[in-house]
Amino acid sequence: HMRNGNNQKYEHAFQVGLMGIDLASEGPISKKQGSSYLFNYRLSTTSLASGGQSNLKYQDLSFKLNFPTKKAGTFSIWGLGLIDRNKADAEERAKWETQADRQSAENKIEKLVGGITHKYFIDENTYLRSSLSATYSKDRISADQETLDGQSIHVGDIQNRKWDILFNSYINKKFNSKHTNRSGIAITGLNYDLDYKVSPNFGLDRPMEQISKGNGKSMVLSAFSSSVIDISHHVTASIGITTQYFALNENWSVEPRLALKWEPVDNHSF
């Protein structure tokens, strides 16, 4: 979980270095209501440190808005984003020793996730936490290979996109000083789009062939209950059960769980 921003005073930071820049800010939205924001952005490229010889670049952004209320609980809006690119060029012809020296490749990754979270205290020992979020990811790898007669052949192009929608909710209840239970559900909508083309044999300089291509969607439903019980001052038990249904193949699974923790002395456990 991302931490909340400072709801009493503003704090800002800006850093510049050989690896890039970093910008951060946090502070109150309303001091009276106790709401706050948190923001961070990073841009990094190794070309600043290597004089332009390297092609590794990435940037990421994160934020969180936190809104506590008097009677309706606490609402949070948050998000994360990442773009990562890595490009490798082929070696000069005079330096070719292996097949890899003739290849150039580029890998680009994009990831986004965001959502809204609500936490509500039913009483001093019980709270309900619910979250609705969405995720998106895109990976692409492309590769070219120079031939001995000076041509360039596209030998790899792999694209994979996924986007999911997730809702989860659980109740956390402390029955007494020795027993705490957490029970909840999760619903996940899955979507995918795959395009996979690659040369059957790089060494023979053959063009790409379609290996796999398709798209689809499915859903995963799950429910769980887990308890942490202090059996004694030195022994703690974790007991739980999870059940899951995968709609794509209509498969049900049930997983019971049991764990024991023994702490003979402070800061040492088995």
PLM feature spans:
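Flexible, surface-exposed loop regions and adjacent strand-edge segments
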Residues: 55-57, 91-101, 145-154, 198-207, ...
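Transmembrane beta-barrel architecture of outer membranes
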Residues: 20-24, 34-36, 56-62, 109-115, ...
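Predominantly transmembrane beta-strands of Gram-negative outer membrane beta-barrel pores used
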Residues: 1-4, 10-55, 60-68, 76-80
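Surface-exposed extracellular loop regions of Gram-negative outer-membrane beta-barrel proteins
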Residues: 87, 91-96, 138, 198-199, ...
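Face-selective signature of the C-terminal outer-membrane beta-barrel domain
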Residues: 66-84, 105-250
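Outer-membrane beta-barrel translocator/channel fold
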Residues: 47-53, 58, 78-99, 269-270
